[in-house]
Amino acid sequence: MIAREEPATTFARRHIGPSSRDIAAMLETVGAKSLEALMNEALPPSIRQKTPLDLGEGFSETEVLTHMQALAAQNQPLTSLIGQGYSGTILPAVIQRNILENPAWYTAYTPYQPEISQGRLEALFNFQTMICDLTGLDVANASLLDEATAAAEAMALAERASSVKTKAFFVDHEVHPQTLAVLRTRAEPLGWTLVTGDPLHDLDKADVFGAVLQYPGTSGVVRDLRPAIAAIKAKGGLAVVAADLLALTLLTSPGVLGADIAIGSAQRFGVPMGYGGPHAAYMAVCNALKRLLPGRLVGLSVDSRGTPAYRLALQTREQHIRREKATSNICTAQVLLAVISSMYAVYHGPEGLAQIARTVHRHTATLAAGLTRLGFAPLNSTAFDTLTVNAGERQSEIVKRASSQGINLRINADGTLGIALDELTIEETVEALWRAFGATWSYADVEAHAPDLLPADLKRKTAYLTHPVFHEHRSETELLRYMRKLSDRDLALDRAMIPLGSCTMKLNATTEMIPLTWAAFANLHPFAPPEQAEGYFTLFENFEEWLLDITGYDAISLQPNSGAQGEYAGLLAIRGYHAARGESHRTVCLIPSSAHGTNPASANMAGMDVVVVACDARGDVDVDDLRTKSTQHADRLAAIMITYPSTHGVFEERIREICDIVHGHGGQVYLDGANMNAQVGLSRPGDYGADVSHLNLHKTFCIPHGGGGPGMGPIGVKAHLAPFLPGHPAIDDATPSAVGPVSAAPFGSASILTISYIYILMMGSEGLKRATEVAILNANYIAQRLDPHFPVLYRNVKGRVAHECIIDPRALKAKTGVTVDDIAKRLIDYGFHAPTMSFPVPGTLMIEPTESESKAELDRFCDAMIAIRQEIAEIEAGRWKVEASPLRHAPHTAHDIADDAWSRPYSRAQGCFPSGSSRSDKYWCPVGRVDNAYGDRNLVCSCPPVEDYAQAAE
């Protein structure tokens, strides 16, 4: 841990919700003499950590910001004109302050409960509309992790949808290098072959199920891709176009060119580069492919009154439903970044975006004219914002001169240089570039002779962003109010506890968020020279050391951009390990029936065959079934994927035995780290038999969920798997046996690592351990209070749960017809987000309070649940029919209380202000219960005027 001089202060006290007095009272309620006694009952003694964490004392908030300023000072955010899909951009201050820095936006969860998510669902609907308009395609999803993984998802979609039987995919030689590398990683375990070449000449002889084409190309060239797209389609394959959104304001859209799929990044729409992320990628498809689209899709439906309402559509496509049949494991997306990019488009409108694009292109054309005059005519005669020049033997000299001007260029191995201009480029930037090449010209002297580098037959003729939302909020006052109106519709952690099991919705402290927007962290290009990112590398080194101490592993990769991507990287490491030992035939992955849907989906993507292991009556892995299947598949056993504590909310007693069984049959143990919030400081996966885990930094380590992303899923491994961690073409320290990259950037979404770094630094060893203990206490307290009303389904042999618990209302459904959906929607009337519904056990609710919630908030939640149970008793007694009850009519809106006619058997007050809820601080749900079936039957995923649907519903 970093040395410090001042004594520790009390950040941990502010992070942990219950006071010492509250903890004592809660311990009495659960019947434990102390926190340590409770831990001894909740955790098996065989896994308890033998030595304490070695992280030192926690820093104060003032101290940690001073420390972060020192790290930031080690970074050098030069003007990076490297390109490759990353551009300098301006995040409008009104969006930075009111979305990126606003907990109403960044502390929200994924909008699975649409009634309390209408604000961000509308913002995502705007994002989808923006993508559809610019790409000219019919349906767009609500973001993916980055452009490279979006390309990999598109390849998988093409393979699934194509009528071609071949297993080869064509990759344009103009695709960004990191995209090609990620495509190789994705293709290899699935037995797919990549064919690279010039699509305008090489496609005729290629037998492929699809192709990805870069538009404009990585060199900057702008080509007419229509012949290539026609050639792909003539073979029965699918055409994927990786397109620059800003360029599409001036260029013919991929849809008009004939593409089936468009992918790319929305980073340059207001999202800082952040040394690699996070950024929102996109995917748009033609209408015929909409049911194969990976990730989340926002659609328009109606509520119980027929009022238009947004919701997540076609969820049966997603990994948590399809499981091992899924072709994608996408779970976390990049919602917060997609919202920022959509607001950037709302802020500028189509005219503003086109003006930015024209300015960038004018600077590019002027730069090209000057370079041509100097004898460095660009190799690409067409361009939007990027030029490639042959510098030959002068390459290093020019790079050095540019660096002295504060500019980074793209250095290519063939002696060429890439120059990618952006929104931040000004005339002085162009003049500085000329100086690097040896001239001292005035911009004005050259501009008049600059040609138009956009091909005339590729200039855009179709309108975009025609919906009123992209025209009505041009003044800051109007935009400010629009963003406030949307955030007021949502329920996030800034309003109330979000008790979602397996999601760890803990405090995202303000101090943890502050350095994120500092220029020294935000404005670094991921492929900038490493010496310009020394502050980041110091952070990486410290952070990895801390995670190793916390987990008991020997090596860490920070590259995965989500927990699901961490799973994928970990399984690839296992696959690489077996291959290196001459055991490539080991492809069976054992997965308990209770596993999160990403587990089987990730195994499928890694080329493994999923074999399901049963769970016993206690919810634990059935060890006898595990032993049977391990023996049955001993020759082919690759791994087991197991979550610990289990998804049933219990520390399984036989975890060491489970690991030993798998190891004894030649397999490796992948321990899903989704529930690591119950282990930090108490137990370490690397000590009790696990070989690899991912860590959800957006759960245990305080990166906010952002309404559905960003996330981070670094993986820890034991020493024998370390050589197989993901590499990256941009860094040269990877081992020869490293698997390929799983993310576009070498360190994933590096900028948000600052959040988790600060959390660990402020909590220190004792604070982190106390957080874990209180998380377990809070869950046991809720279990104790609710069990007389809603039975707790699973406990360990000593009657304890881990950091979450499952309550079981299924008997009540059988008796009264009340569903978990009814309970979830009724909780909204009490001002709460619902617990996790029907996972891992259908018809149940899984509750995780985290350590950050106070006893008062826990009691408020328990009181609400008990009051709901009393309402169910009214149905049991026959005083209400379920169809006429407040549970079935929930959530109640302001429209309900204002109804002239009230014919329900309960009063307005009972419906809208249920027992124990506050009238003065009431959260009013903006819509009634959303009709999911209607939304899927009448799929609308981008916006004509919303009023059209209101009229249609009447």
Curated annotation (Swiss-Prot):
Gene designation: gcvP
The keyword Oxidoreductase appears for this protein: yes
Record-level GO cellular component terms: cytosol; glycine cleavage complex
The family this protein is said to belong to: Belongs to the GcvP family.
Top EC category: oxidoreductase
GO biological process: glycine decarboxylation via glycine cleavage system
A GO term for molecular function: glycine dehydrogenase (decarboxylating) activity
Catalytic activity annotation: N(6)-[(R)-lipoyl]-L-lysyl-[glycine-cleavage complex H protein] + glycine + H(+) = N(6)-[(R)-S(8)-aminomethyldihydrolipoyl]-L-lysyl-[glycine-cleavage complex H protein] + CO2
Protein name, per record: Glycine dehydrogenase (decarboxylating)
Keywords: Oxidoreductase, Pyridoxal phosphate
PANTHER family per record: GLYCINE DEHYDROGENASE (DECARBOXYLATING), MITOCHONDRIAL, GLYCINE DEHYDROGENASE, DECARBOXYLATING
CDD domains in the cross-refs: GDC-P
Parts of the chain that traverse the membrane: none
Gene3D superfamilies per UniProt: Aspartate Aminotransferase, domain 1, Type I PLP-dependent aspartate aminotransferase-like (Major domain)
Protein EC: 1.4.4.2
SUPFAM superfamilies: PLP-dependent transferases (SSF53383)
N6-(pyridoxal phosphate)lysine: modified positions: K699
InterPro entries xref list: GcvP, GDC-P_C, GDC-P_N, GDC_P, PyrdxlP-dep_Trfase, PyrdxlP-dep_Trfase_major, PyrdxlP-dep_Trfase_small
UniProt superkingdom: Bacteria
